[in-house]
Regions:
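Family-specific functional microsites
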Residues: 7, 13-173
């Protein structure tokens, strides 16, 4: 009886938590991690990892939508840049190198930062080369993104990628 009550309360709390999260535009990446085949506990399991502070911080910032990339930082510029115009401005990004029109440019969001920005191609290749999961290389990019942000065994690699990418950003200022 007690187990049933506990299970019911946990389910209710998870449902309320998810409902509240879905209302937040800032949690766009975090919300995208919840798919039908990924459990709630695997999404939050990275919080229990023993990682150095800076790695935990950067990983949490990315997942929670407060990593200082343009999708987030341009919320605070005046005048506010509309979210559909917060393009990636990294010097080696395709947006800059190819002189793309506005409708073809990539918005600098968490997905672009981790999966696509050519500024970080070398770092991304190094990270992918260290991933031991065979199934990772058979996934499409969306599935890879979710895998990278929900799998404990690669959390440290992803966090180190983020730290290294930000170090590279600072060297291009």
């Amino acid at each position: 009886m007690l187990s049933l009550l506990e299970s019911s309360l946990v389910s209710r709390d998870q449902f309320k938590f998810r409902s509240d999260c879905l209302k937040s535009d800032k949690l766009r990446t975090y919300n995208s991690l919840f798919t039908s085949n990924i459990s709630y506990f695997s999404v939050i399991s990275y919080t229990r990892l023993c990682l150095p502070f800076i790695l935990r911080k950067k990983l949490a910032q990315l997942r929670l939508g407060c990593l200082p990339i343009r999708i987030e930082t341009d919320r605070y510029t005046r005048p506010i840049v509309h979210r559909d115009q917060r393009y990636c401005l990294q010097p080696n990004c395709e947006n800059i190198l190819s002189n793309l029109s506005d409708d073809a440019k990539h918005i600098e969001n968490e997905y672009h930062f981790i999966m696509n920005c050519s500024q970080y191609d070398q770092l991304r290749s190094e990270m992918f080369a260290q991933i031991q999961a065979v199934e990772f290389f058979q996934m499409n990019d969306d599935a890879k993104f979710i895998f990278l942000l929900t799998t404990q065994s690669v959390a440290k690699l992803v966090a180190q990628f983020i730290v290294n990418a930000f170090d590279a950003r600072l060297s291009h200022l």
